[in-house]
């Protein structure tokens, strides 16, 4: 299906930089933190990742939208990125799985987007000055002054608890495994065929994380972010998972307190992304806001224990501060881009976490064995509990 683009759009950063381009989504105005992602593929997974809440995503790869969109390559029930910035939208979306071109997909989800701007220049600005607020305005009556005022009024993500905004309203079971080339997404796995009972805190969970847990025999119950530890422990889980999510981890007092209560037991804990940061905070460490964060599918990470390198998918603007880690936490992984902390393991509890995204979507599968380590801890816990 050919895409027809006729409307204008503009992007204004809080430092006053203005880009003019073509509207590729809904009309209107969108304000958020502008970040850049270096992934070549997976734009639909990126858009539907709840971790991008209140963020406008710049995709550095020049051609975005080649394969259109479909109803399977999603990480949540809707689009969470509040805006999209790309260099070029191909006129034709071509894939045997394509159901809707990217522009129409953005319109259907009321997402404002802009194309035909110099994304290399924009990325350099974000690298040099750091992630900053921005405003995309699309449609008629474009107003640079109004857009700049809107960008400057954005409060920023530091101090912002977004997990409570994107979490589920009520608990639900998840028993669906990973997508397959033959058959697509499978039907739910029967509960009796799943060996391990895992409770997953939803701080903005990606569905592929849940799929990979099911692939390893986990009967997953997803619970709201503010679920007390007492309710989780009353379910007698074999393990507790702490999900990814958006925003600053430090304001999430409810999550930190719940994790601290669970840590008093010997229940295995596995955290990813925001869950990693929350585990660090619950253990006594601190977190910090990064200059422009890590967003991409090609980030090298050192596995300290094994002495090898993993290529990983990353999406975070905050990080656990290694200098503040208590004595009972050992560092397991570090970024080879900037040396930032990527993984931790408690020495006195069966709890560990990883800053990147071992479930990928998009990205490589080098870090997928972290899910297997979670299962190993669960097996050990079950044996000791007998």
From Swiss-Prot:
Pathway: Amino-acid biosynthesis; L-arginine biosynthesis; carbamoyl phosphate from bicarbonate: step 1/1; Pyrimidine metabolism; UMP biosynthesis via de novo pathway; (S)-dihydroorotate from bicarbonate: step 1/3. One of its GO terms (molecular function) is ATP binding. It is an enzyme of class 6 (ligase). InterPro entries: Anth_synth/Amidotransfase (IPR050472), CarbamoylP_synth_ssu (IPR006274), CarbamoylP_synth_ssu_N (IPR002474), CarbP_synth_ssu_N_sf (IPR036480), Class_I_gatase-like (IPR029062), CPSase_GATase1 (IPR035686), GATASE (IPR017926). It comes from the Bacteria. Keywords: Amino-acid biosynthesis, Arginine biosynthesis, ATP-binding, Glutamine amidotransferase, Ligase, Nucleotide-binding, Pyrimidine biosynthesis. The active site is at residues 273, 357, 359. PROSITE patterns: GATASE_TYPE_1. Its EC number is 6.3.5.5. GO terms for biological process: 'de novo' pyrimidine nucleobase biosynthetic process; 'de novo' UMP biosynthetic process; glutamine metabolic process; L-arginine biosynthetic process. It catalyses: hydrogencarbonate + L-glutamine + 2 ATP + H2O = carbamoyl phosphate + L-glutamate + 2 ADP + phosphate + 2 H(+). L-glutamine binds at residues 51, 245, 247, 274, 277, 315, 317-318. Residues 197-384 form the Glutamine amidotransferase type-1 domain. Belongs to the CarA family. Composed of two chains; the small (or glutamine) chain promotes the hydrolysis of glutamine to ammonia, which is used by the large (or ammonia) chain to synthesize carbamoyl phosphate. Tetramer of heterodimers (alpha,beta)4. This is Carbamoyl phosphate synthase small chain. The lineage of its organism: Bacteria, Pseudomonadati, Pseudomonadota, Gammaproteobacteria, Alteromonadales. The gene is carA.
